[in-house]
Amino acid sequence: MLDVNKKILMTGATSFVGTHLLHSLIKEGYSIIALKRPITEPTIINTLIEWLNIQDIEKICQSSMNIHAIVHIATDYGRNRTPISEQYKCNVLLPTRLLELMPALKTKFFISTDSFFGKYEKHYGYMRSYMASKRHFVELSKIYVEEHPDVCFINLRLEHVYGERDKAGKIIPYVIKKMKNNEDIDCTIARQKRDFIYIDDVVSAYLKILKEGFNAGHYDVEVGTGKSIELKEVFEIIKKETHSSSKINYGAVAMRDDEIMESHANTSFLTRLGWSAEFSIEKGVKKMLSMKE
């Protein structure tokens, strides 16, 4: 158990990844200040969690508490036609403000959450504004670290995360639901390859990073299994595990012209820390199916 005085300032605590991480941080004995939007209700009530509206962030600076690390998870993908200005607030202005508050918060450790969409060699028109905003913040964070050489900034780039309690519209929960109901599925040829990383492994990567001591600097850390697998193979695994009679209509949906056809994590950084993913896609799907809905 860690020293309970280790306090984490966290954004995105009500998100899929954030909620899972929050549970584990509590188990590890961390205390958490969870920033949220005024209209968002807390997802977990615990004595180790203090929920705080984002606009009240300055109040923390007025206190005498020391923050061990800032963990930024809040993200706006722009999937629901969110105005670009709103995406910019969440993906650039909020984390940049947190960077600027680091001296007042008495912390020199910042962990930011990114995704494989943001890799500079990837181009995906469907999420251009999201990718542009995330890349903008990464560049700003590099400038900040150059100007504050005692700061440790880690950009955690997550591959395709999946697991229980994820949004129903995400590909794995969506296919599982369809398969359970024996409903036919229309999809592309499903030759895209993704590095599917189970949520428990993602959380363990965050915890590993939090517990390690790093030299000051700017780090880009990729989180995944290190191996990619075709969507078609994943669909067939789910069909087998659910004993479904669903028909999968491969090629019924046209592929996007700029589809990212392959992505996998370079796990060398985390491997050097002694971390490795425990869940294969088969093991992860089985665990999801074993959980109560």
From Swiss-Prot:
<keyword id="KW-0448">Lipopolysaccharide biosynthesis</keyword>
<feature type="binding site">
    <location>
        <position position="113"/>
    </location>
    <ligand>
        <name>substrate</name>
    </ligand>
</feature>
<dbReference type="InterPro" id="IPR001509">
    <property type="entry name" value="Epimerase_deHydtase"/>
</dbReference>
<keyword id="KW-0521">NADP</keyword>
<feature type="active site" description="Proton acceptor">
    <location>
        <position position="130"/>
    </location>
</feature>
<protein>
    <recommendedName>
        <fullName>CDP-abequose synthase</fullName>
        <ecNumber>1.1.1.341</ecNumber>
    </recommendedName>
</protein>
<keyword id="KW-0560">Oxidoreductase</keyword>
<dbReference type="GO" id="GO:0016491">
    <property type="term" value="F:oxidoreductase activity"/>
</dbReference>
<dbReference type="InterPro" id="IPR036291">
    <property type="entry name" value="NAD(P)-bd_dom_sf"/>
</dbReference>
<dbReference type="GO" id="GO:0009243">
    <property type="term" value="P:O antigen biosynthetic process"/>
</dbReference>
<dbReference type="Pfam" id="PF01370">
    <property type="entry name" value="Epimerase"/>
</dbReference>
<comment type="similarity">
    <text>Belongs to the NAD(P)-dependent epimerase/dehydratase family.</text>
</comment>
<comment type="pathway">
    <text>Bacterial outer membrane biogenesis; LPS O-antigen biosynthesis.</text>
</comment>
